[in-house]
Amino acid sequence: WTAARFTLMNLEIEENKLPAKDKLQLEDKWILSKYNSLVAEVTNNLDKFELGIAVSKLYDFLWSNFCDWYIELVKPRLFDKENPTRETAEYVLCYVLSGTMQLLHPFMPFITEEIWQHLPHEGESIMISRFPVYDKALDFAEDEKTMEAVMKAVSGIRNRRAEMNVPPSKKSKVIVVTKDTKTYNNSKQFFEKLASANEVEVLPDKEGIDSKAVNIVVDGAEIFLPLEELVDKDKELERLNKEKKQLEGEIKRVEGKLNNKGFVSKAPQKLIEEEKAKGIKYREMLEKVLESINDMENL
């Protein structure tokens, strides 16, 4: 409902249609390709009466692809009345949301009808509208792969900044080292909007990059973040060492239990397995904390 409300608030178009292919931006092709795959998968699930799987795929698409990514990616275009690609974003938003409501209608008839009625449409009811079908013309496999590489880079930056307690309000330079310079030069706006970048530099090699810059490796690229000026090094090291001490204490406690013959012989197997799982989790957490300490000390 929130996604529908956002879409409706930003629509000025009066019909539901797809724009010409040459007007589609990378993020448009990505969401259309993901939606097209969803149509094929859900149709196949319905044919096999795999209703639970169909609903799960619809849920994942709406939240993970449409809401979490596409809407965020196109906000700059929608909010800029002078942007020549604004109308294209509107058409794609409407097309994908309308089609997803049709796919979801068998499971949620009332709310999907209500949303569909507020979108540009043909016909009296979603119930008698043409059910979406797979369209080979919307198979943008290469563009989908390219967009997802950029998304992984954005996610990697956000995760690393979060690990180092750098708030989104503190902007930093982002340096991308990649052979695919064209893709990343054309994607700078995504890093500025979604990864708190105030400058994006795309380079073919690492020459001249500060050795203290934090690096993130993703498929096809290596990202460098010069975060030294944005982090209170002493305060962050104090926090990380405190967390390290707590985790080491938890690991010692778990190991003590599991090495206690009395506990192992008397405790239910389920409880023993739970303690083993805790030990694995704490060791993984400790490994990440140690990596963060190492990164911080090298700043």
Give short role names for the model-derived ranges.
Residues 1-299:
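Feature 926 captures the class I aminoacyl-tRNA synthetase adenylation module centered on the KMSKS loop
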